[in-house]
Amino acid sequence: MCLLKSTGLSLILSALLVIADSYPNSDKTNMGCEECTLKPNTIFPNIMQCTGCCFSRAYPTPLRSKQTMLVPKNITSEATCCVAKEGERVTTKDGFPVTNHTECHCSTCYYHKS
């Protein structure tokens, strides 16, 4: 009887290890958001723009930092945005001046949605 229990337990543990090992190791935080790259603009043909995701995270503000804030906040966030590293000013057929991005990278976010 004891041998049957240990064999059954071994089979269950082996099955759990196989399931855990087959689980994908990919990072789930960026699912649905592509890497920061150049893509064609949907409105202006032949104009490239930087789109995609970079790094962002939020965490509870440490007490020491919170005590030095003028307006204490419970959550602190860090982020980098997909921005143009280089670009050139061009004019569209309709006379609109736009920036055609030539290279992208992740850098400090200057504009945040409120």
Curated annotation (Swiss-Prot):
Q: Which domain of life is it from?
A: Eukaryota
Instruction: Specify whether Acyltransferase is a keyword of the entry.
Output: no
* Signal peptide (residue range): 1-22
Glycosylated residues are N74, N100
Instruction: Kindly give the InterPro entries that the UniProt entry links to this protein.
Output: Cystine-knot_cytokine, Glyco_hormone
Name the PROSITE patterns for this protein: GLYCO_HORMONE_ALPHA_1, GLYCO_HORMONE_ALPHA_2, GLYCO_HORMONE_ALPHA_3
**Disulfide bond positions:** C33-C53, C36-C82, C50-C104, C54-C106, C81-C109
Its annotated compartments are: Secreted
* Molecular functions per Gene Ontology: follicle-stimulating hormone activity
Q: Which family does it belong to?
A: Belongs to the glycoprotein hormones subunit alpha family.
Q: Describe the task this protein carries out.
A: Involved in gametogenesis and steroidogenesis.
Cited PANTHER family: GLYCOPROTEIN HORMONE ALPHA CHAIN, GLYCOPROTEIN HORMONES ALPHA CHAIN
Q: What is this protein called?
A: Glycoprotein hormones alpha chain 2
Originating species? Oncorhynchus tshawytscha
